[in-house]
Every structure is written in structure tokens, then in C-alpha cells.
């Protein structure tokens, strides 16, 4: 094989013939052999079938190789590497087997890849839409094809400026320019060879030293400086290049002076010469300095111009930018430009010039019936209309006036008065004159464009072109169809010849408005006239007949101030009235005395009236009849700079007309429309209700609403409907005639719903009215509790629910405060009820004595609140006599009919699907349902019922006859489950609530501690007042023998109970606790008919109304013993009713003195059993509930085994009550701590029923304070910890082991 191997030309036939190769060659061969070894290894892994196969023809070379391998160790390194390289070369040749194996590989194994490549080529072929007709190559762009065609035509438009070389592309010529380096640019062409550069520098320095030495000896002559200036002048003016064959370096070259300021320095100091700016050398003559700079600092000079550079790269880049670009633009060299001018081929459509006919032919494909959108200014054509639209921005930007006069920046200069460029396009001048009309700041300057073209100041040629341009407009103005006159330009007789020109003019108008919106007087005129005519012609309701269109199209509109109406002014000056519809629309727009936009269409008409007042007197045929000021008030005639100032000024006239137009508000229809909005007090009441309830529709009848104070004016099925209360007090200041006109126009619905301020469009007039409040700043929806005001009713509703929820939902005082203590929080007691008046009116039509408008709650309902339970007063320390007197003063028997009527009305409301929420639900239940239940229970009470003379026992006896099953059904029907947690509404026992700045502050009744957090108040009471009492010993030293009984009852904590004495029997309270968590769930499951139930209508202590006090101690395992006053919640004896069985097993120490101590003494006395009973117990049960209006325990539920098991009773805080059960010995053991000084007098116990009058009056308040302290339970905190009871009537949780067996 005679082929050369891949190893740098080493022959493959004689590997051992060249053992004398040199080291560098061997190193190169070794590197190449390594590379070949890597390639062959990679190929062997990639293509295993291409491994070298045994070939019989190559046995001899193989034997030679074996022979060569044997002495390989004895050969030199060079010969070994050569043999290895040749062997690798033969392996590659054998494995690939030439091009045949490669072809088989491509055809056989990689067909999938080849198919993919073919698909890619097909896609690329599709993307390349421009094929070459000669060679078949395809290109993506036509410009690339035109460059490719130069290879076939031989055109080379780019010529080298230094030689005769030409290139078809600019990049090729730049590559050629790199060859002209280091003297190759031509000898003597402004540069000195590198070998002569150092010689010239040394020569210059020697000459400089000699001159300096001579100058120090000889004085300078005075005639040298004029000579230098005289020589500088001709050199500066001579800019001719040196001839190409000139190579003498001594000739001065006219290079510009690098620092002309040296001339002035030379004139001042005659001894100094010319200084070089690069090396600071001095020369006496200018020629010497130029020669010095050209030789040393700027040796590279351009032969085509005067440019000189210090580096060669700068000179080449200068030639590429300056000279090649110029040559490429011409398409030919500088010498051949005149010769090829006859061979130019120009496009007749766009005027582009080509050097070859073939280029012109390819260029003509662009104009193949596709560029049909032509620009009327420059003549360019486009395929798509949006291309033309974007192109028009170029002309508009050129026409815009960006710079004003520097002396008067505030004065607007009309475009008609500006000097235009001499070479500006004729169409551009016409458009600028058209635009100058829109930019006129006043009427006087509007005639400038007409004077420019009317006085013959234009040349004849321009007049002729303008006449051709304007002739289609004038001819089309007479032949405009009637339908086209409805448009804006049709009314103005400005119909353009083409659609593109129309777009152009509209863009010019918009651009004019953007440049100076204040002084764009005629632009505002054009818009105002267009709105007036569009409103008059295009509205369906205001569509005029054909005979009215032509007079309106040729007339002007003038506002007559005396008659206050618009009149049409003809071309001859005659006046006539406008059509009724058009007059109505403009008159309504002129009513600016309604700032609240009573008519939702007034916003657009106000803008229209602004245009009509100043601009509609402008004759539609031309600008010659304008007489009004730009922005003039129609009432007083004052002129303002902007339209917004006129709108603000119009409010002054509105205030002046208030006194004159008050008589018009007496009408019934207007009164019904306005409702109680004129009365400030009633307006505040109506605004304090739900925004939806005060809205009134325009279709309100004469007698359809209630005109009383605070009542709803009209049933509003649409809460968002516009109303007088939404608009405000000044909404109805217009006269009755204007009101009728507004209603009639609203029914027609013919006005535009576009905002005159920002241009937004709205579907309905109501949305426009609401939107206009943003611009006017009107906020009619005011909050009755703070200074907030909103533009929409939804904003006020959100504000009320976000910041005043407790005031909006609470019908009476805040939860936790007695209703008769109005001095504590008057604002909460006067909070309004948010009830829809239309629903209440339908429910209470048959109730003449019920009035919801007088206040948040009527007097009857307040009395009902007191009658339903006087426990509120008792819980805060009020005597029972006061509450009973208030109960008697309410005159319940006389009001019983009202309660039944209210109950029926409430049922009617509930049956209609109305659901009261939150505190309003509890409010309605506590006043309506309680009266119904009282009436029912009074009828069901047996005649032989036990006589009860205590005031609080009466309600408990009535409620005791009700069954628990009935109680559950009633609560499920009228009292839905309220899962909301409102920690700020209720109060803790032992604390009071005051509301300041919408924040509920809880104050401790025992100290001066105040906080806004109920959790902190609960912790404060637990740590400082209730908990401290537990940790103290008994102050009187009384020993209580209750350890053994406490140990016998495992897991039970016995509360201190009170045993009645001989003369007065008081029921004791014993709270029983089971610390086992299993019994927590067993307690409610084991309830029977004798189980205690909570009161029907709760106060702040009732869990059904407020779960906080009852759930607070649940985490400590404390359970309230009873939630009621007259009904003990424990399992009492069934067979005993008024007898007391004292147990003598426990020693009882009763002091004989009675004393009133402070609340701290009470708390200290009340915890004496803690030292004995808390040793063997995990939890302590302590509670004395203070609610006297709760369900009493039926007498049949008394426990039979009262002596063996402890019974629970309740300590009544207000008055002595009859004995309801027996006191167990377990309860007697803890009795003595209650007979300490200040609590109970020492009296002999006696059997029988005591009289309530026998109770000492001084006992009521200490017992009330004690009950407040002891009723402080741990159930409320569980509401915040997720431990709240799900049932609303959570009373006591009884102990199954202590209850009687049923």
C-alpha cells in the first residue's frame, strides 16, 4: 500500500526504512500516534463489527510486523514510535475498509438518524422560501439571495481605496484591507517606515537641542513671529493630499494644530515657539511642529482625506467607516461612478436604484399586488393597515412641537406661526397646517392657516399640488351621503379622500391634545360639537327626521343667557329654537347646581354643556363666527383656564340658589323622594341603619312610604338602587319641573354613560354616578359612630362590620351590663337595631302599640328584659327589693297582651325565613319568647302550688313546671347554635365593661386593674382575688371536721355549703366535682327528668348567651353546681319539702356576732376548708351562681337518701328562699366557715317554711358580692382553648354518685 498514513506523511510500506528521523519529528509522530490510538479505541467500542478481520492478503505484512516486534526492544525510541504509528494507521484503514464500509454504516445502521436529518432538511427547505434560479440554493431572506446573486453576475460593488481590488461583499473587502499593513498601504502615503522612524526621532531631538543652545546665546528677532503666522495661514488653508509617489519626509504637511491655544501664548511670550502636545517639545516654526507630529506621533495618514492616526488600526477602522461605506452606498468605486450611471436600474414604484437588471427584477416581487396601503404624505406603501398606522407615527412625531420659546415658556405658540423647514414635504406642510388649527390657543390665531393659503403666499407649484389634494375633499363634501354626515367629520364636512388620511387626521388631533391640553381650544371645540351632533343624530330616542338634519349640519349653536336656552344660528344670522330633544339634553347638562350628580347622566352632559357654552356658537362651516371665551361660566360669565375650574366654580352658584329654591321642596312627590333626608336628626337615624334599608327607588308613590321620623321611606327590593339618602341633603335642590325632566330623561335612557373626566364607559347610569364621586370627592355614606365616610354603601357596610360590629349587632346594652345601668355605657344602650323595616312592617302590621322607630328597643321590651329576670341587678350587688319594685313598676299584667302579640309577630318573622344573628337573636328571644313561656307556664301551674313570696322565686316556680324535653325543642326551634366567639362582648363576674373608642375595657371590681383582654382579667381574678382566698387559713380559728368525709369520697371536692339555722333556712350550695375525665362525658349522658337546666333567658352569666363565664374554669375541673336561683341543681330528697335535718356528727361552731366586712375578708372566710379538703383531691369544685331567673328543680326530683349522700343547693345572693331539700352531713361539715362575722347571723334553726321578711336586709349585699366572687368559674377560658361546651344550655354537671336514684 502506497498510501500515506495519518501520521504526518510517514510511508506505510517501509516503516523501518527511516530510523534516522530527528527528535522533533518523532515527538510529533508520538503525539499523533497517541491521538490515533484514542480514536481507534473509541471506534472499536462504538462499532464492534468494524474490528480488524483476518485477511489472507496481508499475511506477509503481519509476519513482517511480528519480525519487527521481536527486535523492537533493541531498536531506538524513534524507530519504535514510527512502527507503532504505522501499525495504528493500518488498523484504521483495515477496520474502515475505505469509503465502502462507511457507506454501509450510513445506509445500514443509521437509517433512523438519516431520516430525521432528512426531515430537518425538509423543514429548513420550507423555511427557505427564496431559491436561486441559477444554482438552486435556497435562502430565508430575499436580501441574502440578492447578495448571493452577485456570485453569478460577477458584480463587485465594493472597491479597495488603495488598490484595484473589488469585493462583492463588504466583509470581504475588510479582510482585504488587512493586507495593507506595515508599508503595504503604499510607499510615501503619509507614513514612514519603521526602520527610518528612530532615525528621524534622533535627528529631531538633535535639532531641538541645537536650537535651544542657540536661542540662549542669540536674542530672538521680532520679525520671526509674523513670519510664523504668515506661514501658518496658507498651510491651514491647504488641505491637499501629498502625491502618491512623494516619499520625502522633510516636506511640511498641512496637519491641523493639535493645540491652537499655543498661538495666543506665543503672542504673549515671543521667546517661546510652537509646543508639541504629545511630547511637550518646542519649535520655532509651524512646519517643524507639523513635521514632528507626522513623523513621531501620527505617522499613519489617510490618503483619501486629512485624517492621521498614531496607530495603524485606527487608520484601517477610519477607512472602513468613512470610505467603504460611501463606496458601498454608491455601489461603485470613486472612479467608476460616472461610467456606470447609465447602467442604473430604478424601480418605478418605490424609486430604489439597482446596478443590475437582475436585482431590479427580484426587487419587483415586493410590489406584486400586495402593497395596497399607501401613505398620503411620503408615498410609501404597506401590505397591512397597521403597518401604515405605525408609519404615520413617524410623521406625527416630526410635526410635534417639542421646544417652546426660551423667553416665554408659559405662552403657547400656534403651529401656524412656526417657520417650517425649506425641504419639508408638501403633504407634511398641509398636515401641519391642519394640525395648527387644533393647537390654536385662542380664536384670533385660528385664521392664520387660512391667511397662509388665502393670500397667495405660496408658490404656484405648491398651490397646484394643494389644489389637487383638496379637490377630492371639496367634491366629496357636496356628495357626502346622509349617513356619513352622522359622523364627526361628516358634520364638519371634513371627509378625507382615503381612510388612511382620515386616520392620519384623527391621530393629528389626538397628538395635538396630548401636546397642550390646556390651550387646545379648537380640539375641545371639535370634540364638543361632535358630542352634541352625535347626541342629536345618533340617539335612537332623539333620532331626528331628514328635514332637520340638513339645517343642523349648516348652522351654529348659541346659548342665550337671558332666556337660558340654546338657539340655532344660521349662516345668515337668523335664530331659531333648537329641537325639543336636543334642547332638553343640553338644558339638563347645564344644571350644575347638583354637585351630587342626582342625574347619573349629568356627568356627560356637564361636559357637553361646557362645550356648548363656549364652542357651539362656532359655526360648523368655519372658524370665523367664534365669539365666546374658551371656558366661561354660563351663570356669571367668568372665564377660567381649565374646564375643571369651571366645574369647581359652579358649586358657588349652587349655594346661592339654596334659599330661593327651598319652596320647591314642599311638594309631596319631592318629599316622598327625599324622605327624611332634610331633617338632620332623622337623617342620622336613617344613615345609622343598614345602607340597603334606606335606599329609595325613583318609582316611589305619593303615599307609599312612611314619613315619620326614623322610619323607612320605601320598600327597596334593590339595596344598591340610587336614593336620596345616598346622595345627601342637597340632592333634591332642583325644582319640580327639573325633577320631572330628569325622570323623563332617565326613562328615555338616551344619554351617554361615559365619564367626562377619565373617559371610562359604564353600562348603567348608576355605576356612572358612583364613579363620578371619585372625581367630585363626594362621600354620602357617613358612619354614625365615627368620622368615616364612603362613596358606596358597600364601603360603609364593610366599615361597620369591621370596626363597629358590637354596636351594629347589639340591640341593647353590651352583654354583661345590666340594662338598668345606663350611666355606665350610654352609647351601647342606644345602639341601633339593624332590622329591615320592610320585613318588620309586614310582620307587625296588626300591632298598633309597637314602634321600632323610636329607638333601638321600645319601653315595653325594656320592661320585658327586667321582668324576664331581675338577676342582673342582683348579680352586681343590687338588693332584691329594688329589682322587685322595678318588676312591679313594669306592670306586667297590663302588658301581657303586647307580649303575646310580639311573640306572634316574632313567629311570623321566623316563618318568613328571617334569621336574626348574633346578639340580636338573643335579644329577640329574651323579650319575645320569655313572655310567651311565662304566659303558658302561668296557666299550667297547679292551684295547690307552694306559695312563694320572694320575687325571684316566682320566676323559678313558673319555670319549674316546664319539661326538659319541651325546653330542648324550643331552643332548637328558636335558638340556632351560635359558634362565633366574641371575647369582647361578655364580661367576667367580678369585672365591669366600659367601651371607649370602640374598645371594650374590663375593670376589676375589687381593685383598680383595667385591661382590654378578657383572658388577662380572668387570670387577674384567679391569681389576686379568688386564688388568694384559697391559700389563706380561716381567720376565726374555726376547725372543720371534714377530712374524713373528704377522704371517704374519692376524687370528690366538696364545696362549702350553708346549713340553714332555726329561724331562717337558706339553701346551701355544694359544687360537686369528679376529677376523673370519664365522668365528664357520663354526666350529660345520665341526665334524667330531675337534671338541672339553665335559665330560659340568660343574662351575662348564662352560658346560652355567653359561654365565657361558664367555660372558664372547665380546664381546672370545676363545674358549676347550678345555673339558677330558685331551683337548686343538685339531686335533693323527694319525700321532704321544708324540713331541715341537722347532722350532729360534725362539730359546728357558730359565732354569735354579725359583722359586715370587706370583700377580702369574705374571700378569706370562704376558703377555710381548703387546708383540709385539698390534701386528698386533685381538683376543687367551687361555684355559687348568681342567676335567680333559672329553671327550678322540681320537687319530685328530690333525693330519697339525703342523709347518706350530699345534696347540692344554691346560695341565693338576694333574698332568703324556702327550703328545697335536706342538707347532707357532708355539707354541714363545711357550714361553719359561712357563719363567720359578716356573713350569717347566729340563729336557732327551726323547721318549716320561713318568711322572706325575716331575712336581715344587711345580708343582701355581702351575699351578692360573695356570689360574684364564688361564681367566678373556669368555664370561660375553655372557649378560647377549644374546650367550650357545644350545648347552649350548659348548667351544672351532676355527680351520679351523689344524686338520688331515679
UniProtKB/Swiss-Prot annotation:
Gene Ontology molecular-function annotations: DNA-binding transcription repressor activity, RNA polymerase II-specific; retinoic acid-responsive element binding; zinc ion binding
Alphabetical list of SUPFAM superfamilies matching this protein: beta-beta-alpha zinc fingers
Modified residues (Phosphoserine): 828-829
Keywords, in A-Z order: DNA-binding, Metal-binding, Nucleus, Phosphoprotein, Repeat, Transcription, Transcription regulation, Zinc, Zinc-finger
GO biological process, one term: negative regulation of retinoic acid receptor signaling pathway
Disulfide bonds: none
Residue spans of biased composition, Polar residues class: 677-698, 869-883
Tissue specificity remark: Expressed predominantly in the brain, while a weak signal is also detected in the heart and testis. Expression is abundant in neuronal cells of the cerebral cortex, hippocampus and hypothalamic area (at protein level).
GO cellular component term of the entry, any: nucleus
Stretches with biased composition (Low complexity): 1198-1212
Biased composition (Basic and acidic residues): 657-676, 935-973
ZnF bounds (C2H2-type): 130-152, 158-180, 274-297, 300-323, 345-367, 373-395, 631-653, 753-775, 781-803
Alphabetical list of InterPro entries matching this protein: Krueppel_C2H2-ZF, Znf_C2H2_sf, Znf_C2H2_type
Region (Disordered): 1-26, 650-736, 804-832, 855-897, 935-988, 1133-1261
Compartments, as annotated in UniProt: Nucleus
PROSITE patterns attached to this UniProt entry: ZINC_FINGER_C2H2_1, ZINC_FINGER_C2H2_2
Keyword Lipid metabolism annotated: no
Keyword Zinc listed: yes
Acidic residues composition-biased segments: 1161-1171, 1179-1188
Role of this protein: Transcriptional repressor that negatively regulates neuron differentiation by repressing retinoic acid-induced gene transcription. Binds and interrupts RARA from binding to retinoic acid response elements (RARE) composed of tandem 5'-AGGTCA-3' sites known as DR1-DR5. Recognizes and binds 2 copies of the core DNA sequence 5'-CCCCCA-3'.
Family: Belongs to the krueppel C2H2-type zinc-finger protein family.
Name of the protein described by the UniProt record: Zinc finger protein 536
